[in-house]
Design a protein with these regions (language model features):
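Sec-dependent N-terminal signal peptides
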Residues: 3-11
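N-terminal soluble domains immediately following signal/targeting peptides that reside
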Residues: 14-158
Length: 158
């Protein structure tokens, strides 16, 4: 019992910082569908620090103010290349699920995918121990990697 308490206490004193990014190639629509799960309090703190504004990501009334800030932040910290060509991410929006913000993006008009390169340094400036998990699925073939700060780039071949 004491061991469980101490383990829980240590976990509380040493929080972990992780995000998860899913990139799925939709063969039907010829697009990349991207979702990124980030703890909303960490995302909110990063946006406040970067833009010097007091924000509340949980208030729907602030969505109009937050969407452009989240878009700009993700454009800077999450970048993709497909078949050695950089692609532009189109921000679709975000939603809150429990303690996380799910941010949605897409890249339209993506034909055959042979290779995807990703740079993901989301929250690296905020947390030295930030880890960004990346999962990429093309034609049902799922590949994954873990990017530990400062390592921010990975390449996947299909």
């Amino acid at each position: 019992m004491l061991h469980l308490f101490l383990t829980s206490l240590l976990a509380f004193l040493h929080p972990f910082f992780v995000s998860v990014t899913e990139v799925n190639h939709n063969d039907k629509t010829k697009s990349l569908e991207i979702s990124t799960k980030i703890f909303f309090n960490d995302l909110e703190a990063a946006l406040e620090k970067h833009y010097q504004k007091q924000l509340d990501i949980l208030k729907p009334a602030q969505r109009e103010q937050l969407d452009p800030l989240i878009n700009e932040y993700l454009q800077k910290h999450l970048q993709l290349s497909v078949n050695d060509k950089p692609v532009k991410l189109k921000y679709l929006g975000y939603e809150i699920e429990q303690d996380a913000a799910w941010c949605y993006l897409e890249v339209p008009q993506v034909g055959r995918v042979k290779q995807i390169e990703i740079r993901n340094d989301v929250l690296f400036a905020e947390h030295d121990s930030q880890t960004n998990m990346v999962h990429i699925t093309v034609k049902g073939n799922r590949k994954s990697t873990k990017l530990d700060n400062p390592e921010s780039q990975a390449s996947f071949s299909f």
